[in-house]
Regions:
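A general structural signal for short secondary-structure junctions and capping/turn motifs
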Residues: 35-37, 46-48, 58-59, 128-133
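Phosphate-binding glycine-rich loops of NTP-binding sites
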Residues: 1-31
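Short, well-structured alpha-helical interface segments that form or flank functional binding sites
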Residues: 11-19, 38-42, 134
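Extended, charged alpha-helical "arm/stalk" segments used for dimerization and assembly
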Residues: 61-64, 69-150
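Flexible phosphate/Mg2+-sensing switch loops adjacent to catalytic phosphate-binding sites
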Residues: 28-43
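Gly/Lys-enriched N-terminal cap/neck module of very large, oligomeric protein machines
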Residues: 45-46, 52-68
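A generic structural motif
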Residues: 5, 52, 146-147
Length: 151
């Protein structure tokens, strides 16, 4: 998502990206302007895997859970604990790599203004305040190349 180069239009790009991160199990959105201004709310979203659509809801006031719902947004339960939901996503996206959590793999490369990982001089540094070695190890694991490295 890109805005104008001069940054003149603040159209909520960061809030939208934080909401997307929230859908994937992140929590930074809970402290965002979106929640501060419109208070607690529920985000409804869907994923499609192998031709099957899965609809969910995640509420800011109950962020530890993700609820299964119908396409019309009716909650149908059962709910999943956030960690269980994130693990389900990891399996669906085939991202079960040694030494790499799904959340770290995903959120490390979301470049969102308020997430403190927007260092344009070090674009491979996916983990703020960590050395480049950890960021490179993350990329190696993300591309499932650990087995190719000889020690």
């Amino acid at each position: 998502m890109l805005g104008k180069e001069d940054g003149a239009n603040s159209i909520g790009k960061s809030s939208a990206m934080l909401a997307i991160d929230f859908v994937f199990g992140g929590d930074t959105y809970l402290k965002s302007d979106g929640v501060k201004h419109i208070r607690h709310h529920t985000i409804f979203f869907a994923f499609q895997f192998c031709g099957q659509k899965y609809c969910f809801a995640r509420a800011t006031e109950d962020a530890d859970n993700a609820f299964l719902c119908k396409e019309n947004h009716d909650l149908m339960g059962p709910y999943r604990m956030k960690d269980e939901f994130v693990n389900w996503l990891k399996v669906q996206y085939h991202m079960d790599f040694d030494g790499l959590s799904f959340r770290i793999a995903l959120s490390s490369f979301f470049r969102i203004y308020s997430k403190d990982n927007t260092d344009e001089r070090r674009p491979l540094r996916g983990i703020p305040r960590k050395d480049m070695e950890k960021s490179i190890a993350l990329l190696v694991a993300l591309f499932d190349r650990n087995k190719d490295i000889q020690v």
